[in-house]
UniProtKB/Swiss-Prot annotation:
The keyword Protease does not apply. It comes from Pelophylax lessonae. Shows antibacterial activity against representative Gram-negative and Gram-positive bacterial species, and hemolytic activity. InterPro entries: Antimicrobial_frog_2. Coiled coil: none annotated. Its main location: secreted. Keywords: Amphibian defense peptide, Antibiotic, Antimicrobial, Cytolysis, Disulfide bond, Hemolysis, Secreted. The keyword Acyltransferase does not apply. It holds the Pfam family Antimicrobial_2. This is Esculentin-1. GO terms for cellular component: extracellular region.
Length: 46
C-alpha cells in the first residue's frame, strides 16, 4: 500500500545520499592525491 511505497522511496533516497557522500570522500582523496603527485613532480621530489 501507501506505506511500502513511502518506505521504498525513503530507502532509495538514503542510498543515493549515502553514495553521494562516499563519492565526495573518494573524490576528495583522488583530488588530494593528484595534487600531491603534481606538487612533487613540480618540485622534482617524486
Amino acid at each position: 500500500g501507501i506505506f511500502s511505497k513511502l518506505g521504498r522511496k525513503k530507502i532509495k533516497n538514503l542510498l543515493i545520499s549515502g553514495l553521494k557522500n562516499v563519492g565526495k570522500e573518494v573524490g576528495m582523496d583522488v583530488v588530494r592525491t593528484g595534487i600531491d603527485i603534481a606538487g612533487c613532480k613540480i618540485k622534482g621530489e617524486c
